[in-house]
Design a protein with these regions (language model features):
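Ligand-recognition elements built from short beta-strands and adjacent flexible loops
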Residues: 536-551, 555-695
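Second-shell loop/turn segments in exported
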Residues: 49-52, 80-90, 98-101, 121-129, ...
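Extracytoplasmic
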Residues: 56-59, 66, 75-77, 145, ...
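Acidic/histidine-enriched alpha-helical segments
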Residues: 111-120, 254-266, 327, 391-395, ...
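Periplasmic/cell-envelope proteins involved in peptidoglycan metabolism and beta-lactam response
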Residues: 1-281, 372-380, 489, 545-562, ...
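Beta-lactam-recognizing serine transpeptidase/beta-lactamase-like catalytic domain environment
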Residues: 70-72, 207-220, 259-301, 307-538
């Protein structure tokens, strides 16, 4: 009986399952055929729901100078509009409005009057009124002009110092989709790093509204903001270079000019001013997209004698006291090499030949070396190839020489082409005991969290000359300045080499006009402890040697004054380079004892027992006398006496402490708001310092 009952129950269950199955099939068939559930049309319902994906834009990183002064940032931009025939307040006095806006928008009064006279509801005051900054907007708002209003645009890039270092910084433009794209200079080279990575958020919404459907999932990926880039440029020195180039352009009508200052020991580019330049806030001012520092190739002239003479010394082919007959030299093929002083200076020594820039002396030495040897030295110095500096469109020049005549002219910088950045790299051999150092322009890259992701540092390219060779070159480079009063600088010991190169004619041969030359100068100072290399070149300056030299020496004097580089303060230890270790988590007393012999200026912050932070970090280099900041695990911190500190040093001090900082002026600290020795309240205090230039 039990077995029969079980069978009946099983059949009943199977029947129920089958009925449910057919019921579900029937329901699904109904839904498919009718597109309805409980009277709701599914197609209409689905059509009313949409997946929205919104871009979360990353903030573009800023660009700073080496001392933390902002050079490029991202700001809101606006378009100036004028209501003419609207139901709002219209422009009441068109002539007065045009006259007031003309200087601010850099548009003619006539053009503005033309726009304001249109028979329209409103007009945009383009081009000058398009994409203006908040600073310009505020200037216009102060005028309280009736009928003038603003439309907010996409964000744009703003360059605080206009034409300042324009080819180095470059520019970025806002595209139609709102993205800011780097186009030139650092903005272009590091576009990806500055841009960061956009994020997004995805969610469901009804098409009838802009709101997210409640209780539905949202997929979000945060934007990763772009990193900030700190250049090696010192704004104070850059301003000096800019002033010098401006003089070359406007006083001497120079076709183009470049004035670059490089740290003699590390290769950091401290300043580089050029003509032409442009205002990156107005891309209409760009007439030339090539940077004269890295993209212009030219015959350098007699500055190349630094390297042909040094190569002869290195190869044992040079005796400075040996004499030769100056004036002219005839090569085997009949080519006559002449000195700039056609009659020559009589029979003179090779040392004097360098000081007087004798082409005959350079040719004689080059013939002793031969094509292969001189070519090898030029190649080892970095000519004929890119230096690899962090800028696009770097040219390589041409140092090819085959024949005796090409060897001769290459020894004094004719028949070969170089770039200014190559000259600076090669000159670094004269300040690093014969070792060539790679130039660089990025000091560090800092991500959105404040982490240093890249630290620029000294990079060795190749050892080319011995210490003995460099010492001899210093001796004869000093003579160049000693025998020529135009290159002497008060209170600054300077050595260098001048250059005057003929300019190749498109028709063959060379141009022959009065000013058809490229003038150049390579300077190193101070002579005993080189801190800076200055390289200057200009095409067709309409000036005398004295006027040309005065612009350069004035700039050198100002740079030396700013950097506190006088003969009385020179110290051989300043040239010593120290590579730092990691001192974090070490015992303070032990570490200070270890560092004593390195002659570093150590700023110990707090009286704790252990070191919890340092700057610069491990593997960074310092020169003897430069500051190393060490933060200890103290319970309280007292204010340092900051008098005489650079703003970069003050920023480092405040950053490592977490102390808020405000400053004004340029140069070195003159006064500070928190007295030295005062206990710091890091949460509530703000340090204010006033800077001034040294005299």
């Amino acid at each position: 009986m039990k077995k029969r009952a079980t069978v009946k129950i099983s059949k009943f269950i199977i029947l129920i399952v089958v009925l449910l199955f057919f019921a579900i099939i029937a329901k699904l068939s109904y839904v498919v055929l009718s597109n309805k559930v409980d009277g709701i049309n599914l197609q209409e319902k689905a059509a009313s729901i949409a997946t929205v994906k919104k871009t979360l834009y990353a903030d573009r990183g800023s660009i700073y100078d080496v001392n933390g002064e902002e050079l490029a940032s991202t700001i809101n931009s606006y378009t100036v509009i004028a209501y003419i025939n609207s139901n709002k307040t219209n422009v009441t006095d068109k002539e007065m409005t045009a006259e007031a806006l003309s200087p601010i928008l850099n548009m003619s009064k006539e053009k503005l009057m033309e726009l304001l006279s249109k028979d329209l509801y409103q007009v945009e005051l383009r081009p000058g009124g398009y994409g203006i900054s908040e600073v310009i907007k505020a200037k216009i708002e102060k005028l309280e002009l009736p009928g003038i209003d603003f439309i907010k645009n996409s964000k744009k890039r703003y360059y605080n110092k206009s034409t300042f270092a324009s080819y180095l910084i470059g520019y970025a433009k806002t595209l139609d989709d709102g993205k800011i794209s780097g186009e030139l200079g650092i903005e272009g080279y590091y576009d990806d790093i500055l841009s960061g990575t956009n994020g997004y958020t995805k969610y469901l919404k009804y098409t009838s509204s802009n709101y997210k459907i409640p209780n539905t999932n949202e997929d979000t990926k945060k934007a990763k903001n772009g990193s900030d880039i700190y250049l090696t440029i010192d704004s104070s020195i850059q301003l000096i270079a800019e002033k010098a180039v401006s003089s070359m352009k406007y006083r001497f009508n120079t076709d183009w000019a470049v004035f670059t200052v490089m740290d003699a020991k590390t290769g950091a580019i401290v300043a580089s001013a050029t003509s032409p330049n442009f205002n990156p806030n107005d891309t209409n001012t760009i007439k030339e997209y090539m940077n004269p520092l890295i993209s212009y190739q030219y015959e350098p002239g007699s500055v190349m004698k630094v390297f042909s003479f040094a190569s002869a010394i290195e190869e044992g082919k040079y005796n400075g006291e040996e004499t030769f007959k100056s004036g002219s030299y005839t090569l085997d093929d009949g080519t006559v090499i002449r000195d700039s002083e056609r009659k020559g200076w009589g029979t003179i020594s090779f040392d004097e030949g360098f000081a007087r820039s004798s082409n005959v002396a350079a040719t004689t030495l080059a013939l002793r070396l031969g094509v292969d040897t001189l070519s090898e030295y030029y190649n080892n110095l970095g000519f004929g190839k890119k230096t690899g500096i962090e800028l696009s469109n770097e040219a390589i020049g041409d140092i090819e020489m085959v024949y005796q005549s090409e060897l001769a002219t290459a020894s004094f910088g004719q028949g070969v082409s170089v770039t200014a950045i190559q000259m600076l790299q090669a000159l670094s051999a004269m300040t690093n005991d014969g070792t060539v150092i790679k130039p660089y322009i990025v000091d560090k890259i800092v991500d959105e969290n404040g982490t240093i992701t890249y630290q620029g540092e000294r990079q060795v390219v190749k050892k080319v000359y011995s210490n003995k060779t460099v010492s001899k070159m210093h001796e004869i480079m000093k003579k160049v300045v000693e025998i020529n009063k135009y290159w002497q600088v008060d209170n600054v010991s300077l050595m260098g080499k001048t250059g005057t190169a003929q300019i190749a004619s498109p028709k063959g041969g060379y141009l022959t006009g009065t000013y058809d030359y490229i003038k150049s100068f390579a300077g190193i100072f101070p002579t005993d402890n080189p801190k800076y290399i200055v390289y200057v070149a200009g095409k067709k300056p309409e000036s005398s040697l004295g006027s040309w030299a005065k612009v350069i020496t004035t700039a050198v004097e100002e740079i030396a004054s700013y950097a506190k580089l006088t003969e009385s303060k020179s110290d051989a230890d300043l040239t010593k380079i120290i590579k730092l270790d990691n001192y974090i988590s070490t015992n303070l007393e032990t570490t200070l004892e270890e560092l004593k012999s390195k002659k570093i200026n150590i700023i110990t912050i707090g009286n704790g027992k252990y070191i919890i932070n340092q700057y610069p970090l491990k593997n960074k280099t310092l020169l003897s006398g430069e500051k190393l900041f060490i933060l200890t695990n103290a319970t309280e911190y007292k204010m340092e006496n900051l008098t005489g500190w650079s703003i970069g040093e003050v920023k480092t001090y405040c950053d490592i402490l977490g102390l808020k900082l405000e400053y004004s002026g340029y140069g070195y600290v003159k006064s500070q708001s928190i007295e030295a020795g005062a206990v710091l309240d890091l949460e509530n205090m703000t340090l204010t310092v006033e800077l001034e230039k040294t005299t």
